Structures are given as C-alpha cells and as structure tokens.
C-alpha cells in the first residue's frame, strides 16, 4: 500500500471510487462537486494505491488556523479493511507537523460520522439535509487522546 499525492491523471479512478459509494454514503449530486473540488479547490489531496489501483482518497484543506479533512472515501468493496483509518492517520500526522493548525475539522454525513467518532472526532453540530435531501451534515472536531 502506498499513500501519495493526487495527480490529475488519477481523476477517473478517484471519480470511480466516489461512484462506488453513491448513494450509500454520498448523494449523486456530489459527483459534480468532487470534480469541481479536484479542478479548483484542491490543496493537499492524497490517494492510496494497492496493486497499481487507487483504492482510497482524501484531502486536507486549510482556513486560517483550521484544517479540514475533506473528500474521504474508500472503494466500497474495501470498507472495514483499515485503509481509511491509515489514510486518515497519515493526514492527521501531516497536519500536526505544521504546527500552525489549532483545530482539525471534518464535515461528514450521518452515514459516515461513526468512522470519525471511532478515530477521535467529537460531534459539535448537525445540520439536516445539508449536502442533499436525506444527507445531513455532521460537524466534528478532532480531540487528541
């Protein structure tokens, strides 16, 4: 398993990963949102390669002294394999080495918040139908143990 920075040539594989998680974890309209993000809003974004295939992806965005865990997903056939946890930990470690970040945030849905909760994030807010009808936004902050 290799974690490396995203490259433009990864686009179709990353979009296929997202598609494998629609509609269980992401709303169909988020497909276009991800394309926009990767084209115009990307800051630090990483992919996980296994056997020459991208099996997970996730990013970090920054705003003032906050770091946002963004656009996380793992191939739907590999959920529970530990790859998502490894990618999350990789990004948390990168954020911590910068020193300027005071708070690590994730905005997720009611379908994925349990993953973040198990990995040290605490719910601070919830907004109904934020991402799309039936997809609430759960605002969580990392609390290091």
Segments (PLM) and residue ranges:
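Active-site rim helix/loop that mediates acceptor-substrate recognition in acyltransferases
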Residues: 24-47
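Conserved beta-strand in the GNAT
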Residues: 47, 53-61, 66-73
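Conserved acetyl-CoA-binding loop-helix of GNAT-fold acetyltransferases
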Residues: 74, 80-93
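A conserved beta-turn-beta hairpin within the catalytic core of GNAT-like acetyltransferases
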Residues: 61-70, 79, 98, 134-136
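A short beta-loop-alpha structural element at the N-terminal edge
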Residues: 1-14
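Conserved GNAT acetyl-CoA-binding A-motif
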Residues: 95-108
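Conserved catalytic-core motifs of GNAT/GCN5-like acyltransferases
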Residues: 105-107, 117, 122-139
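Residue-level recognition of the GNAT/N-acetyltransferase active site
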Residues: 7, 75, 107-109
């Amino acid at each position: 398993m290799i974690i490396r920075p995203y490259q433009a040539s990864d686009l179709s594989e990353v979009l296929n990963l997202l598609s494998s998680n629609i509609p269980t974890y992401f709303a169909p309209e988020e497909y276009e949102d991800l394309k926009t993000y990767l084209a115009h809003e990307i800051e630090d974004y990483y992919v996980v390669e296994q056997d020459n295939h991208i099996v997970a992806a996730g990013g970090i965005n920054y705003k003032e002294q906050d770091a946002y865990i963004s656009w996380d997903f793992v191939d739907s056939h590999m959920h529970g394999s530990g790859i998502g946890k490894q990618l999350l930990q990789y990004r948390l470690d990168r954020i911590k080495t910068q020193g300027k970040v005071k708070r690590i945030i994730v905005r997720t849905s009611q379908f994925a918040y349990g993953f973040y909760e198990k990995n040290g994030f605490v719910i601070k807010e919830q907004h109904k139908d934020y991402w799309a009808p039936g997809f609430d936004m759960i605002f969580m902050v990392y609390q290091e143990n």
